[in-house]
Regions:
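Cyclic nucleotide-binding regulatory module and flanking cytosolic helices
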Residues: 1-31, 71, 76, 81-85
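Glycine- and acidic-residue-biased ligand/ion/polar-headgroup-sensing regions
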Residues: 33, 44-57, 72-74
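Short phosphate-coordinating micro-motif centered on Lys-Gly-acidic
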Residues: 36-41
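Short alpha-helix-to-loop micro-motif enriched in aromatics/charged/Gly
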Residues: 61-68
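Cyclic-nucleotide recognition modules
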Residues: 69-125
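Polybasic "coupling" helices that flank or enter modular domains
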Residues: 97, 115-180
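Phosphate-/nucleic-acid-contacting segments
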Residues: 147, 156-219
Length: 219
């Protein structure tokens, strides 16, 4: 599929605006683990995922990571272009969780079109509101939801994303997603194993009882 099939307001642009984007559009292939955007040091531009998976996260003062949200096929990220929106000062890092093909609209190009096009401006505001809603939901989870429920939710989300109950993932990776410490996650997973919910092996977690994990995350 072409870029115009992925950009929701493409048909709302005039011919000159379409040409401006097409002439400046960057196509990029990134390997798993590549950092695409690194906080306010970068003004990468608007990212649109053609295929693959990206992770957007923040770093605490102590260097702990916590995942804000993930980006999948046809998802767009505006926080990588937050420099064009003066009211937003949000330092995020974006890295590829899988090999990813993406498009980048340079920040200044998008900023100019956003000023000219009401549909693009409206779409941008809606997308930003959605992302901040995701972040607020995450904050609520961290503040009010116990770690066992958050780990259960994460494992179930991973099985849905990967399409398998045999997850290739480390305890450190889970800790980074949840803003916790590896040792704490290890203790929790060992507890889950003792309860017959999962089976642990080096670099792998097998989900044995999804129904009980679902019950745990809802309790």
């Amino acid at each position: 599929m072409n870029f115009d099939n992925y950009f929701p307001v493409w048909n709302e642009l005039n011919t000159a605006q379409k040409k401006l984007i097409s002439d400046n559009l960057i196509t990029q292939h990134v390997k798993k683990g590549t950092v695409i955007h690194n906080g306010n040091l970068d003004c990468t531009g608007l990212l649109l995922v053609k295929s693959g998976q990206l992770r957007t996260y923040i770093l605490s003062d102590e260097g702990r990571e916590i995942t804000l949200y993930r980006l999948f096929d046809m998802d767009m990220c505006l926080l990588s272009a937050s420099c064009i929106m003066r009211s937003i000062q949000f330092e995020v890092t974006i890295e590829a969780e899988k090999d990813t093909d993406l498009w980048i609209i340079p920040a200044e190009i998008y900023k100019g079109i956003m000023k000219e096009s009401a549909p693009v401006a409206n779409y941008t505001n809606e997308l930003m509101a959605t992302r901040f809603s995701d972040v607020m939901w995450l904050i609520e989870q961290i503040m009010w939801k116990s770690l066992d429920k958050r780990v259960a939710s994460f494992l179930l989300e991973e099985t849905s994303i990967e399409g398998t109950n045999e997850l290739k993932i480390t305890h450190e990776t889970i800790a980074n997603h949840l803003g916790s410490h590896r040792e704490v996650i290890t203790r929790m997973l060992r507890y889950f194993q003792g309860e017959g919910l999962v089976r642990l092996s080096r670099g792998k977690i097998a989900i044995l009882d999804s129904k009980r994990l679902e019950t745990l995350q809802r309790s």
